[in-house]
């Protein structure tokens, strides 16, 4: 017959296993809904292609931003000289955001059996979150026309980055 201390330890370890099993079961359904399964049947993009796509995403996003600023100032002349339209202002934020997205793509290809599906939805969610500061500066009284251009810039960055990454650094089939 086991001593009382042994019985308490056995019950404690059984309880811990049960709790961990309950947590695992609770996380399995949400993970399955977003295809976060850690069992992809494909190979990750080639590292060189990811690097190329990263450079192209940064360049394409900065170019899109610059063009949108030019269009925005042409459409709304009162926005000329707007502080957030300076390359030094939007450029560093664009580069940081694009680099984060470019780092996320190979990670998602490793943890998801449907990385394009998950990356697309992640890009939408992140873009919506990144619009919040724009709404805040609009609330603070920044010019509506200028803030609208900033919002379009966010959308352009998301479109450029997503498309460049999934096309220039696609997942590879299994061997």
PLM features: residue spans?
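Short juxtamembrane and helix-loop transition motifs at transmembrane-helix boundaries
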Residues: 50-55, 78-89, 109-114, 172
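Interfacial helix-start motif at the membrane-water boundary
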Residues: 87-100
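Internal alpha-helical transmembrane segments of multi-pass membrane proteins
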Residues: 106-127
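Membrane-helix boundary connector in multi-pass membrane proteins
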Residues: 132-149
